[in-house]
Structure formats: structure tokens, C-alpha cells
């Protein structure tokens, strides 16, 4: 800890995995006043939302058990970052002054307007509110009513598995492939588990229309669906673009390799909403923690007048649960490409559960107790050298103008 007379005001926007960890880690200095802005009064374990929807687990934690001493929690939503006046405008009408902002607003996942009927009839599971709506819809639905899950990624797989294990009649529409980021052997394991447990897996297949009681496939086929769950694709909030900050095509804040905005060195990004060098890391709970830590370290370095370090993160693989009694841990190279090795079955389920607990207990809570203590695997590939804001802005390619 260091002692100073002047407090540096840091506003962290978003209380997910990246933002909450960043808020805790900022306390390596005792001259930093940290305000965490989040639209909900509780922390949401996003990687457990499929359990919450299926009533096989909870997905919220009281912030009082997660935040370090002295952090102010403001339950509100940011509507604009005014870099000229260094203020964050909130939905309530309140304005927060800042010296630095950590932009950790996360990602979203709503049914796309481009698919007829999806917005009106499909339900997402990407956020707590949508998962709660899904839970209520499931409660009102007969057990044998057909449920369609759209999306063959990890969220879709976990949702389908959780529901079929509860006795639901589930169809999984996979798009081009099931678990496309996994190895061939890992994909076969998942496909076999789903088939044995009664999930009807359609691949390759795509949904071209969602109706109140059915889905229409791209090949013209119609499948009955009393409830359609949309898990395909993610987006991000438009706060950065609405604030006149440059973003990539998806809306993620463009930064250099220290996670500093290409437009303003007092705005630092973390988690799913960051696009360092126009080459963002995989949107994931795995990357969120290290990115939150690096964002906090960048702010601390700027306060101290030292050069911030660049991103250094190696991936090790990914986990997916298959109900409560099975799962798979897919191993990967440092660059996040899968190798032909996985751990399945009950051991895979145990690894997934330990991973979920680790993110909260050994990362977020440990940073609350001992700021600066978190470490993570390093050595993954990134653009060579320190990429400056100007270089990032000129080479990003897909940039949305302010």
C-alpha cells in the first residue's frame, strides 16, 4: 500500500467478473477512491445462468461478500461517458466525476431482429433478467412440451443438457457445427452424451423464423417449439459508441495492448467489451479476470507515472457442463486452439464446478482480501511490441465512427 494526500477517483462501469475484480485490485493503492457502477444490487455468476433457468442452482451473490473495504457500489446504469468533463452520466440523472474509468460493461445476447419472430417469441439466457424470464416460462410449461435451443456453442450445449436432464423434450439447432471450438474427439463426446440423453441435435441447421409455437429452419422444415431459447451470438452495450469513443464492428471499445482507449488515456477497458489492437481475446469468464486485473494495473501505473504493462495471457482450454453429473474439460494450446485431449464424465463435471468456484473464491474474493495477489497463465500470442493508441486506431480495420 502507498499513502498519499490526494485521492484519485476511479469509476468502474460494470460489476461482472472483470469489473468486480478490477475494483478490488485497484486497492493496491490507498489513495484511490473506487466506485463500482452496476445495474443490479447483486453479482451475477453468468456461467451459472443455465442452472438458474433450470432451477438446478443459484446465480447471484451478495456484493458485500465480494467487494473489498472502501469500494462504493452504485446501483445504476451509465448512459454516457463525457471525456471532456470527466464525468459519467447515469440513468438516474446522477453524474459521477472521475480521474479514470474502467470500461467493463460486458456483453449481451438478445435474439436478433434479423430473424423474423425471434425478438417476439425467443428468450435469451445471456443476462440475469432474461434467464429469469426463461425460468418463469419453463415453470409454466408442461414437462413434455417441445423446447428448442438455438446455438451450438457452449451456452447452447449447457442449456440443452441442463433442460434434458430435468426431463424436458429438447431440440438443439447447431448452425454449422456443435462445439466448433472443441477438438473432434471432444465434439464427438458431447454429441454422444446429448444423443443418449434424448436431445435431438440438428446440424448443420439454422433457424430462419421463430413462431409462437414453432421454429422454421433454413431448409424450410418446421419444428414444433413451445419455447425457443436463443443462445447464438453475442453483442455488447453501445455505451462506448454513444459516448463518441471508437469501437470495433461489434461495439467493443478499441484499445491498445495496455487496454487503454485509443481516444483517451484515462479510459481503460476490460472483459468482453474490450478490443485491444482490434484483436480481442475470446469473450469468456476465463479471460475476464486477467483482463480486469490488467486494466486495474494500467490505471495504477498511470497514477504512479510509470509505463503500463501489455496484455499477457495464455489460454489453457474450456469447460462445459452436461447436466449435473457430467462435463468436459477441453485442453488447448496457449493461443486457444484445441488439442485432441479432453477429460469427460464425472471428472469433467467436477473440473467445471471447481472452475466456477475458483473464479469467485480464488480470484475475486482473494483480490478483495489481498489486492494485487492474482496471477494467471502467460505467454499467449499477441501483436508484437506495445501497440500505441494511434497505431491501433489506424490498423483496426472494422471501426465504427463516433
Per-range role (PLM):
Residues 72-81, 85-88, 96, 166-257, ...:
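A Rossmann-like FAD-binding core segment of flavoenzymes
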Residues 12-14, 103, 150-151:
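Conserved N-terminal Rossmann-fold NAD(P)-binding element of oxidoreductases
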Residues 1-7, 71-146, 229:
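FAD-binding core/adjacent interface of flavoenzyme oxidoreductases
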Residues 15, 105-106, 112, 219, ...:
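Glycine-rich, N-terminal phosphate-binding loop of Rossmann-like dinucleotide-binding domains
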Residues 2-72, 158-184, 402:
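Beta1-alpha1 glycine-rich phosphate/pyrophosphate-binding loop at the start
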Residues 241, 249, 273-323:
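A conserved FAD-binding loop/helix module that cradles the flavin
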Residues 324-402:
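C-terminal auxiliary extensions adjacent to catalytic cores
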Residues 118-143, 222-290:
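FAD-site-proximal beta/loop scaffold in flavoenzymes
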Amino acid at each position: 500500500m502507498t499513502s498519499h494526500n490526494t485521492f484519485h477517483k476511479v469509476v468502474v462501469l460494470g460489476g461482472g467478473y472483470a469489473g468486480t475484480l478490477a475494483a478490488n485490485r485497484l486497492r493496491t493503492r490507498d489513495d484511490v477512491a473506487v466506485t463500482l457502477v452496476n445495474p443490479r444490487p447483486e453479482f451475477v455468476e453468468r456461467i451459472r445462468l443455465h442452472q438458474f433457468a433450470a432451477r438446478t442452482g443459484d446465480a447471484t451473490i451478495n456484493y458485500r461478500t465480494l467487494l473489498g473495504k472502501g469500494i462504493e457500489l452504485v446501483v445504476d446504469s451509465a448512459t454516457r461517458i463525457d471525456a471532456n468533463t470527466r464525468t459519467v452520466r447515469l440513468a438516474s440523472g446522477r453524474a459521477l466525476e472521475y480521474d479514470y474509468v474502467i470500461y467493463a460493461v460486458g456483453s449481451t445476447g438478445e435474439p436478433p431482429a434479423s430473424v423474423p419472430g425471434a425478438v417476439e417469441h425467443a428468450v435469451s439466457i445471456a443476462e440475469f433478467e432474461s434467464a429469469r424470464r426463461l425460468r418463469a416460462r419453463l415453470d409454466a410449461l408442461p414437462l413434455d412440451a417441445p423446447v428448442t435451443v438455438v446455438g451450438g456453442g457452449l451456452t447452447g450445449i449447457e442449456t440443452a443438457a441442463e433442460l434434458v436432464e430435468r426431463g424436458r423434450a429438447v431440440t438443439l439447432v447447431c448452425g454449422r457445427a456443435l462445439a466448433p471450438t472443441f477438438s473432434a474427439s471432444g465434439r464427438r463426446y458431447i454429441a454422444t452424451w446429448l444423443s443418449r440423453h434424448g436431445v435431438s441435435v440438428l446440424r448443420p441447421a439454422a433457424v430462419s423464423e421463430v413462431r409462437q409455437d414453432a421454429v422454421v429452419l433454413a431448409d424450410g422444415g418446421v419444428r414444433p417449439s413451445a419455447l425457443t431459447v436463443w443462445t447464438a451470438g453475442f453483442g455488447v452495450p453501445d455505451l462506448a459508441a454513444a459516448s463518441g469513443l471508437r469501437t470495433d464492428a461489434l461495439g467493443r471499445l478499441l484499445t491498445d495492448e495496455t487496454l487503454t482507449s485509443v481516444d483517451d488515456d484515462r479510459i481503460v477497458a476490460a472483459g468482453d467489451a474490450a478490443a485491444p489492437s482490434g484483436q480481442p481475446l475470446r469473450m469468456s469468464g476465463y479471460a475476464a479476470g486477467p483482463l480486469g486485473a490488467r486494466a486495474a494495473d494500467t490505471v495504477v501505473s498511470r497514477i504512479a507515472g510509470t509505463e503500463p504493462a501489455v496484455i499477457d495471457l495464455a489460454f489453457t482450454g474450456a469447460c462445459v457442463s452436461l447436466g449435473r453429473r457430467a462435463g468436459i474439460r477441453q485442453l488447448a494450446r496457449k493461443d486457444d486452439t484445441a488439442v485432441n485431449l479432453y477429460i469427460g464424465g464425472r471428472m469433467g463435471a467436477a473440473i467445471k464446478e471447481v472452475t466456477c468456484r475458483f473464479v469467485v473464491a480464488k480470484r475475486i474474493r482473494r483480490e478483495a482480501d489481498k489486492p494485487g495477489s492474482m496471477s494467471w497463465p502467460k505467454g499467449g500470442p499477441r501483436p508484437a511490441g506495445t501497440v500505441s493508441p494511434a497505431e491501433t486506431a489506424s490498423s483496426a480495420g472494422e471501426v465504427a465512427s463516433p
